[in-house]
Regions:
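Secretory targeting signals
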Residues: 143-200, 210-213
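Aromatic- and glycine-rich beta-strand/loop motifs that create alpha-glucan
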Residues: 1-32, 197
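Hydrophobic core segments of alpha-helical transmembrane domains in multi-pass membrane transport
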Residues: 30-39, 105-106, 208-216
Length: 233
């Protein structure tokens, strides 16, 4: 082991990217595709419903908003009923909380896989026997997490801007996606330092995600401050 606490970080970073290049690519492509396809599918559904009713998509959106604003189950599962009579507000309601939960899961699994899971498999011990510092592994996986979330946030913003959404709001939404992912990556990094086994660290991180979802659900249904405590709020 090197005396330099961060020695070998670059090599470990390249190793993580080589091992996870397919997984991370699939995660990012899947999320960005979901984010990009949803507006088009929503618009098609609204247009079809408007054609059946002989009205406009805006009127259908307003009708559905009136129903959803009083539906506690939908609010608990999907998020606050803000601006549901607008296309952007309806999109955030339909997929916002769900997407953030997936982003959180991606980050939790990434951190656990390259920390405690590596130690349990014995690969971490082999790496540490070389000229690698004690903080190199955590630093390398943290860099990967930051880069992954930045790419996701940027991709999300680009998709929204390409769809004709407001540039400022698109950037804000992409930033919120990236920051939520980084928060759960940080939570996972804390738990892998507390617990010896990867499953325990992953379990506690997922428990944190469940608590965040529950706080958001209760806060949104009751329209109170609890949702402000949740990174999914």
């Amino acid at each position: 082991m090197s005396r330099n606490g961060f020695a070998g970080t670059t090599k470990l970073l390249r190793l993580i990217l080589r091992l996870d290049r397919i997984k991370l690519t699939l995660w990012l492509l899947g999320l960005i595709t979901l984010i990009g396809i949803t507006p088009y599918s929503m618009r098609a559904i609204l247009d079809a419903e408007a054609e059946l009713q002989g009205t406009t998509a805006e009127e259908v959106l307003a009708q559905q908003a009136a129903l959803l604003e009083t539906n506690g189950a939908s609010i608990a599962l999907q998020g606050p009923p803000d601006a549901l009579d607008t296309f952007g507000g309806r999109y955030a309601f339909e997929i916002g909380a769900f997407t953030l939960a997936i982003v959180a899961l991606m980050n939790i699994l990434l951190i656990a896989r390259h920390t405690r899971a590596e130690e349990e498999s014995g690969r971490a011990e082999l790496v540490r026997a070389a000229a690698v510092g004690p903080w190199s592994a955590l630093t390398a996986v943290s860099i990967v997490a930051v880069a992954t979330n930045l790419i996701l946030g940027l991709g999300t913003s680009i998709v929204f801007i390409a769809d004709g959404r407001d540039v400022g709001r698109s950037i804000l939404y992409g930033a919120s996606m990236a920051l939520s992912g980084l928060l759960f990556a940080a939570i996972a990094l804390i738990w892998v330092q507390v617990f010896e086994y990867g499953r325990a660290a992953t379990g506690m991180s997922l428990a944190g995600l469940a608590v965040a979802f529950a706080l958001r659900a209760v806060g949104d249904v009751r329209d109170n401050w609890l949702s402000l405590l949740s990174p999914l709020g």
